[in-house]
Amino acid sequence: MNHSVALNFADGKTFFIAVQEDELLLDAAVRQGINLPLDCREGVCGTCQGTCETGIYEQEYVDEDALSERDLAKRKMLACQTRVKSNAAFYFDHHSSICNAGETLKIATVVTGVELVSETTAILHLDASQHVKQLDFLPGQYARLQIPDTDDWRSYSFANRPNASNQLQFLIRLLPNGVMSNYLRERCQVGQTLIMEAPLGSFYLREVERPLVFIAGGTGLSAFLGMLDNIAEQPNQPSVHLYYGVNTEADLCEQKRLTTYAERIKNFSYHPIISKASEQWQGKSGFIHEHLDKNQLSEQSFDMYLCGPPPMIEAVKTWLDEQAIADCHIYSEKFLQSNTAKT
């Protein structure tokens, strides 16, 4: 029996490998061209150290000088001593080039549609089935897309979960003069080819053991759509609270899809928040951190995922510090304005 294992690196690259039931993780990686750093292969030196972020694994001998009891409690592991017992994801705190891992997968995808889901947002639908058996990625990760007939690339989070038919979705904000935005408005046609590099990013859904708080700003929602799709298919579902902030009512998108999660996820709550609300808006207004409930968040431990503009993320983190809410794990991804930004 093979297990699908994601190897994530500090430069944001992810490589998926197949690991046999009784195979050491290090051996499986090397067999598939990913030469994880190593010295001893005996569980002593600690060179092949990583962290298991999701999945079940066992270790053979681990010397106390390589990993302490505290390290082991934090799911630190040695690839040379690790055997996986389920699909899993591991993080290694070094650049993937050290492993001679090569480039992430570049795929020729086909445009199957562009769907306007708000006045300022579209979903780009791509089909990757002609060029890859199934694209593996972790819910929350992103891809780089090359705008046809240019050297420009833009990065967007997957808005759905991996699927056998390789139908992919990306939530894209339509900017007044954005490179991708202009392409979608003026030149994009069904049947065109887009080159995609994927999967990328260290922002993804870890193994779920505690309640979840998702905080999305603008098209940062895209990453959470993939996560929610994944959670909805799981037999053991955590409670999930989604806070979704946008500038105006016109920016809200995927409202019907978001409300269906209440039917698919047992303990799901959804809180749309408008920062520049009109007089007609009857919901929450202002900024997301102004609507977080200190009492609720202090009652239990939880994992918080944040995706969106840097000011939103910093405001939430500052609020958590000011309220002395410490029993939470925070994972975040900022949308930055650059040649490879998610714009």
UniProtKB/Swiss-Prot annotation:
Spans annotated as Ferredoxin-reductase: 98-338
GO MF annotations in UniProt: 2 iron, 2 sulfur cluster binding; ferredoxin-NAD+ reductase activity; metal ion binding
Ranges for domain 2Fe-2S ferredoxin-type: 3-96
Protein's UniProt keywords contain Metal-binding: yes
Catalytic activity, as annotated: 2 reduced [2Fe-2S]-[ferredoxin] + NAD(+) + H(+) = 2 oxidized [2Fe-2S]-[ferredoxin] + NADH
E.C. no: 1.18.1.3
EC main group: oxidoreductase
UniProt cross-references to InterPro entries, sorted A to Z: 2Fe-2S_ferredoxin-like_sf, 2Fe-2S_ferredoxin-type, 2Fe2S_fd_BS, BenC-like_FAD_NAD-bd, Beta-grasp_dom_sf, Cbr1-like_FAD-bd_dom, FAD-bd_FR_type, FNR_nucleotide-bd
Function statement: Electron transfer component of anthranilate 1,2-dioxygenase system.
Record text on subunit structure and interactions: Monomer. It is part of the anthranilate dioxygenase two component enzyme system. The other component is an oxygenase component consisting of 3 large (AntA) and 3 small (AntB) subunits.
NCBIfam families tied to this protein: PRK11872.1
Protein name per UniProt: Anthranilate 1,2-dioxygenase electron transfer component
Organism: Acinetobacter baylyi (strain ATCC 33305 / BD413 / ADP1)
